[in-house]
Amino acid sequence: MGSKDHAVFFREMTQLILNEMPKAGYSSILNDFVESNFFVIDGDSLLVTCLGVKSFKWGQNLHFFYLVECYLVDLLSNGGQFTIVFFKDAEYAYFDFPELLSLRTALILHLQHNTNIDVQTEFSGCLSQDWKLFLEQHYPYFLIVSEEGLSDLQTYLFNFLIIHSWGMKVNVVLSSGHESDTLRFYAYTMESTDRNQTFSKENETVIQSAYKSLIQHLEEIRVLVLATHFEHLKWNDMMEEAYQTLFLLQHLWSEGSDIQRVLCVTSCSLSLRMYHRVLVHSNCLSLQEVEDFCRLRCLCVAFQLHLPLSQRACSRVITCSWIRNSDSFLKMNKWCEYFILSNLNVFGCWNLNLNHVSDLYDEQLLKNIAFYYEFESTQEPHLNLGDSIRRDYEDLWNVVSHLVKEFNVGKSFPLRTTRRHFLRQEKSVIQEISLEKMPSVGFIPMTSAVIDEFVGDMMKDLPILKSDDPVVPSLFKQKTSDELLHWHAQRLLSDDYDRIKCHVDEQSRDPHVLDFLKKIQDYQQFYGKSLESISTKVIVTQTTRPKEDSSGASGEILQNTKPHQITKKSKKKSFLKEDQNKAQQNDDLLFSIEEEMKNNLHSGIRKLEDYLTSCASNSVKFGVEMLGLIACFKAWKKHCRGEGKISKDLSIAVQMMKRIHSLLERYPEILEAEHHQYIAKCLKYLGFNDLANSLDPTLIGDDKNKKKYSIDIGPARFQLQYMGHYLIRDERKDRDPRVQDFIPNAWQQELLDVVDKNESAVIVAPTSSGKTYASYYCMEKVLRESDVGVVVYVAPAKSLVGQVAATVENRFTKTLPAGRTLCGAFTRDYCHNVLNCQVLITVPECFEILLLAPHRQKWVERIRYVIFDEVHYLGREVGAKFWELLLVIIRCPFLVLSATINNPNLLTKWLQSVKQYWKQADKIMEEKCISEKQADKCLNFLQDHSYKNQSYEVRLVLCGERYNDLEKHICSVKHDDVYFDHFHPCAALTTDIIEKYGFPPDLTLTPQESIQLYDTMAQVWETWPRAQELCPEEFILFKNKIVIKKLDARKYEENLKAELTNWIKNGQVKKVKRVLKNLSPDSLSSSKDMVKMFPLLVEKLRQMDKLPAIFFLFKNDDVGKRAGSVCTFLEKTETKSHPHTECHSYVFAIDEVLEKVRKTQKRITKKNPKKAEKLERKKVYRAEYINFLENLKILEISEDCTYADVKALHTEITRNKDSTLERVLPRVRFTRHGKELKALAQRGIGYHHSSMYFKEKEFVEILFVKGLIRVVTATETLALGIHMPCKSVVFAQDSVYLDALNYRQMSGRAGRRGQDLLGNVYFFDIPLPKIKRLLASSVPELRGQFPLSITLVLRLMLLASKGDDPEDAKAKVLSVLKHSLLSFKRRRAMETLKLYFLFSLQLLIKEDYLNKKGNPKKFAGLASYLHGHEPSNLVFVNFLKRGLFHNLCKPAWKGSQQFSQDVMEKLVLVLANLFGRKYIPAKFQNANLSFSQSKVILAELPEDFKAALYEYNLAVMKDFASFLLIASKSVNMKKEHQLPLSRIKFTGKECEDSQLVSHLMSCKKGRVAISPFVCLSGNTDNDLLRPETINQVILRTVGVSGTQAPLLWPWKLDNRGRRMPLNAYVLNFYKHNCLTRLDQKNGMRMGQLLKCLKDFAFNIQAISDSLSELCENKRDNVVLAFKQLSQTFYEKLQEMQIQMSQNHLE
C-alpha cells in the first residue's frame, strides 16, 4: 500500500491521535440547548458507531436505523444543528463488506427522504477543495468522527479526517463513548491545538501524497473484489445492468410501488442473472439452490410487509449461521442490492415510496423461515402462510420470473425444491430465554407521612412483596464488620458550614481579632465603593422610631427669644452672602463655557452637558440650553461660510438638533414665542422648512441662504442616520419617593411594587438595564423591617460572591445588636458571618446545604427574601441541579433575575404552581399550629408574623430594550493593518430563519441600521409598492416631526422587519436573499498569525476613542500572553520626554513624609516595638507605592504609550489620602501574578481569569473601574456579575464555549449607562459564519432535568425525619418531589418520578440506610454528606460496612499509628477508583506506552474490593431492572413502535390468519421492558442487567436511562463494547509529587489537573472528618489512615502550589 514512507507516516499520524486522547475532555458538547451549535457529523463514523453497538446484530436493518435515529434525536433534542456528510471516497472502505455498502446507501436515502436533516454527499474526500471551502463557509463548532473503523484502512481514512479538521481549526468529537440525558449530550472532545495545526501544516505535502496512495490501494481492492464475484464485468457494467433491471420494472409497475418490493424483486432477479452468467462452481450453491434462496427472500419480504413490529419483536432467535457455500451468492446479492439502490436517483419521476427503506433486510426473520422449511416443515400438518402473505409472495416471485429472461426460475411453490440446508446444523439452534436472573417484581411495604402523601395513590396499584418473599427477610440481617460495632453509625454529621474554616473567630472579643475584622470590613467598603460610586445609606430599623419632641410650645417660645432672633438674622445674612457667592461662581462658569464654545464648539458642549448634569434648576438649565443653541447656530453659519462650502461637518448640525430636541421636549412650559421663532430659524437654516413652518408659519426664508446652509438631507433621515444614539427615550418624569438617585422606568417601578407587596417575580431584562437595583431595594426593605430577617442573594458563581458582598457593605450600614452583622458570605472555600448576618451572599451549592440541613431550620425560617441572579444557569451543566431544588424548597418570596431566557412564561407558570402549593401548605400548618398552641404542643416556627404578610403571586416583569444600542464590527487584517467593517445584524439571518422563526427577539437595529435596511430594500426592489409609505420622510411617525424619539425609531424598525417577512410570504424570497447579501460585509481578510496583530488592534481602538475595553478570550494562558504582548508593543513605541517639575514635587513630598516616618520610628522603637513594627510595614508599603508611581513615568510615558486614563492617573497621584493604589498594591505583593499585574497596570493593562487569586482579580477590577486600567483581557469570568461595564467588548478568540448565551452575556458589558450612548462589539479572528450564528441564534430555553437521585432521596428523608420542625420539613420535601420542572404539566413524567422515588426507597432499605418507616439507619449521614459523588458515596459506605478498609489499613508495626507507603498507595488507588474517575477513550489502549515513572492508565481495584463492588452492582442492577419492568407497563407503546426521528410507524393489525406466523413469532416472554426494535436482534429483558447494553435496549418513553441507576463498574464500556480505561492522575501525583510530569504524560492541562487534585484532597478531608465524628475510638486504624492520607496529600499539594508560585515569580 504505497511506499514505505507512507506506512511510517500512517503510524506517526495514528500515534499523534492516540497521544491526544488522554487530553480529550468529556463534557456536554451542546452548550445548554443553544441553537448556535452548528456542527458536522461524518456519516460513515455514524454508521460504524451504530454497527458496533453491543446490542445490535448485523443483518437487522430496522434495529440499525433505530440506533441511528436515537443517536440523532439525542443531538436534536438538545438543540443540535448539524449536517451529515458522506464522502465519496469513504465507499472504498466497504468493498470487503458488500452488505454494508447497501446499508450505507439505504441510510443516505432514508436520511434524505424521511428526515429534515441536511445530508451532503457531493464531497469526494476530506482533502478536497470543496470540503475545505465548506468548512470555511460554515465553520462548524466540531466534527463528530470515529477514531476506529471496521478495518485498518477505514481507520486511516478517519485519521486523515481528524488531522485535516485539526488543521482547519475545527475540534473533533469522538462518536463513541457518548452518553445523553434529558438535557445534555456528553462526548469526548479533542481540541484543535497549535501542535496539531502545526503537524497538519508541516506535513501537508506528505498528507496529500499518503491519502492518494491509500485511495489508489482501495481502488485496486475494488477491482479485485468485483472480479471475484462478477469476473469480467466492471463497475460501470454492473451499474448499467442494475439500471436496465429497474427500467424493466418501471414499465411493469408504472404506477409505482414501495422500496421493499422493488429492491426484493430487482436484487433477486439481478442476482440470479449474474449467478447464472458468471458463477457456477462446484463448491458453491447450484443455480436451483440459489432460486430456492431467492424464494425464501421473497417470502421474508412478504412477512415484513404484513407483520407489525409488535409481532416481529416476538420472533424466535436462530443462533446458527449460513453455510459457507452460500457466502458467494449472499455477497453477490448484497452487491446487487447496492447497485440497485445507487441507481434509484435516476428514476426520480417514478412514484417510489421510500418510507420503509429502513426495513429492507431482516436476517433473523429470514433465518426463521429458512429454519422452518429445513427442519420443521417435514412434520405434519404443514402450517399455512395466510392468504395475504401468500398472495404478496406469489406476486413478488412472478415479477422475479418476468425480469429473468435468460432462464426459467420455476414456480413460486414449493419454496424448497432442493435438499441442501442453508443453515448450519448446530446443537443449540434456537436461543432460549431464561428469566431466572430477573428479580421479583414488587415493592417492600413502607409507610411514612411523606411516602403516603406522595405515592400513596400509586401504591395500591403496584405489586407489593409479601413478608415471606425471600427478598424481604434477608434485608434486615445484613452483617456489619465487627470493627464498626463501636461506631456511632446513626449519628448525624456536621455539614459543610461547620467544617469550612472561617479565617477568624467571629464571636471573639480579642482586640486583635476585632481590629482584623474592622480592617476586613473597611476594605470591603473600599472595594465596593471602587466598583460603584454610590454613597453609603444608613439603615434604621422601623421598630426603633425616634422619640417625639416633648418640649411642645416651650420650644416655640424659646425660638422667639432675643438671642435666637439675633442668631436667625446672622444666619440669614450668611445664607444671602453664600447665595451671592454661588451666583457669582455660576456666572463665571457659564461665561467660561460660552467662551469655550466660541473657541472649540465640541469641547464647550461637553462642559455644557457636564454643567447640565449637576444643575438642579430647570430655568437655569433652559437658559444654558438656549446658550448652547445660539453657539451651535453661530458655529454652523461660520462653518458653512468657510470650510462648509466644500464639505459640511454635520457634527455641528447634530449638536444643534440635540439642543433643539432638549428644549422642545424638556422645557415646553418655559418656551415662549420668541424661542419658537429662534428654533424655527435654526431649522430653516438646516433646510428643514416644513419643520420650521410648523413652529413659526410667519417665517420667511431666503433661498440663497437655504442652499448655503442646508444639509441637503431630509429631517427624518438626518435624525435617524446621524443622531440615532442621541434620540430621546420615553422615560418617566415623575419621581418615585422610594428612589432617590434616578427616576425609575415603568418596569422598575413594578419591581419596587413587587417587593413592597412581598410578592415574587421573574425579571428578564438586558444587561445594564437596571434590574439589579431591585435586589438592593429588597435588601434595604428587609434590613429596615427588623434585625433578624435575612435576605439571601444567590450568585451563579463563587467569583461573584466577593463583588456582591463588597457592594452591599458599601451601600448599607446599620447598627445591629451584639453578635449580628450586616453582610455574610458562604462558598465551599470561604465562610464569613453566615448565620448571624442579615444579607447572605452565597452560591447555589452552599445554599442547598443550609436548606436541607435538618438542624438549620430555625435559621431558614428567618429568611424573608431570596434573590436568584442569572437564573438561566438553571439549564447549565454545572450547578443546574441546585437551582431547581432551591426554587421549589424556599417558602419565602423570591426575585429571579436573568438577561437571557427564551421561555420566561413557562418558568413563571411553573413557579406560580409552586407558590400555590406553599399557599395551601402554609394555611394547613397555620391551622395546625393554632390548634396545637391551645394544647401547648406547637413546635412550629411559623409563629413569626412575617410569613402571614407574604403574597403568593409570581409576576413576570419584562424589559426588552437595552439602554444603550450595540453596534457590531468585524475586524479585518489587510496590508499589516487592522480595519473595521460595520456588521448589520440582518446580515446574520437567512430566509429560512426568517420564514421558520421570524426575527430573533433580541436582534435589534440601531436607527442608522434601520435606514440602511430601508435603502437596501428600495435598491433591490425598484418597484416596491410600499417604498413611499416606509420612506423615512413619509413614515407616519416621522413626517413633520421635529423630535423623533427612540420609541418611534423602534416602531419603524418593526415595520421594516414585518415588511421583509411579508416579502418571503408573498414569494419574493430571491429579493430578500439579495437584501441580506447586500447587507453582508465582504469576506474577512485575515493574517496567518492574527495573534501578532492583537496589539495593533488595541492601539487602533485607542486611536478611535473606544477604550475602556474588555477583550474576551477562552484560554487562561492566552489571556496573560495577550496582555503581555500589548505591554511589549507599548514599550517598543515609547518616546522619551523630560520630566516636569510638578512630577518631581510629588516625589519630593513623599520623600519628606518618609523621612518623618524614619525619625518617628527611631523614637518609638525603644518604647513600643509593636508600634514600630507597624510603622515599618507602612514604610515598606509606601516605598512600594512610590516605586510604582515612579515606574509610571507620567511625564516620560506620553499619553500614546499608556492605555490608562491620564486624568485618572493625575487625580490618583495628587490625592493625599485614600489613594486607590496605596490600598490595592500591598494586597498583591506576594501573590503568584502580583508582580506581572503591577507591571501591566503601569501601562493601563490588566488580565482576569478563573485561576487568579481573588486579590489579583479585585486588583484588576478596582483599577479598571477607576480608569487606571482600560485594557483588560479576560475569560468568561467577567461575563457574569456587575460593575465592569466598558465602552467596547472585543471577542478576540474563537472557542466552543463562545455560544449564543455567552455571546449575549459578554457583549452586554459594552456601553456604560450614563457614560456611553452606544456600545461597541468587535469580532477579531472569529469566522464570519460563526458571527452570523451567534447573532441569529435564540437564547436557550430553560428545561427541567431529571430531578431525583438516590442520595437526594436519602437527604430528603433525613430532613423529613430529623428536621427541627417536622411539619415544615415534610412540606419542603413534598415540594421538591411534586414540583420538578421536568414534570410540570406532564402527567407521565410525574408517574415515572414517583416510581423512581419508590425504587430509591427500596434500594436505601436494602442497603440499610432507611427502615420501613423511612427513618435513617446506619451510615445514612455519611452517604448523604458525600452527596456530590453518587454512586461513589454509596460504594464507599458499602466497602466500609464490609470491613474492607479495616482489612487494608494495617499499621506499619504493632502499636504504631503510622501506615506504610504501600498501604497509603493502595488506599489512594481505591479512592481514585471511587472519587477520581476520569475515563480515557477506549482506542487509547492501542497507543505505544513507554513512560518511565508515570502510568496513564489507573490499575484495577484490589481483588476483595472488586468482588464486593460486583456484588453491590448486581444487587442494584436487579432492583433497577425491577423498577423498569414496573415502569414499562404504563409507557406509550404506540410511540415505541415508531422510529424516534422520522416518526415512521411500524404498527398495524397483527396477522392472525397465518399459522406459520403464530409459530415463528411465539416468544413473547422476557420482552416487556425493552424496545421492540432491539428485540429484532434477539435482546431480552435480561439485557437490562448488562451495563454495556442497558441504555441501548431501554424503552425510550419510560423517561429514565441507565445513568439513573447508582452503578459504579470497575470498568466502563463504550457503545461499541470496548473497555475505557481510567486516568491515573491522582495516584501518579501521590507517588511522584510532580504536576509537570502529570501535565505531559496524563494529558490533563495544568489548571484542570490542579482543580481535580484539589477536589480529591477536599473529598479525602471530608471523609476523614466524617469518620472521626462517627468513631469514638480515635485509635481506629481506618480513622488514623484517612487522617494520615489527608494530611500527606494536602501537604504534597501545598508544596507543589508553592513551588509553582515561586517559579512564576522567578
UniProtKB/Swiss-Prot annotation:
Keywords: ATP-binding, Helicase, Hydrolase, Nucleotide-binding, RNA-binding. ATP binds at residues 765-772. One of its GO terms (cellular component) is cytoplasm. Its EC number is 3.6.4.13. Residues 545-580 are annotated as: Disordered. The keyword ATP-binding applies. It catalyses: ATP + H2O = ADP + phosphate + H(+). It comes from Homo sapiens (Human). Residues 565-574 have a biased composition (Basic residues). GO terms for molecular function: ATP binding; ATP hydrolysis activity; double-stranded RNA binding; RNA helicase activity; single-stranded RNA binding. InterPro entries: DEAD/DEAH_box_helicase_dom, Helicase_ATP-bd, Helicase_C-like, P-loop_NTPase, PIN-like_DDX60, SKI2_subfamily_helicases. A motif (DEAH box) lies at residues 869-872. Residues 1205-1354 form the Helicase C-terminal domain. Belongs to the helicase family. Residues 752-919 form the Helicase ATP-binding domain. This is Probable ATP-dependent RNA helicase DDX60-like. GO terms for biological process: defense response to virus. Residues 551-564 have a biased composition (Polar residues).
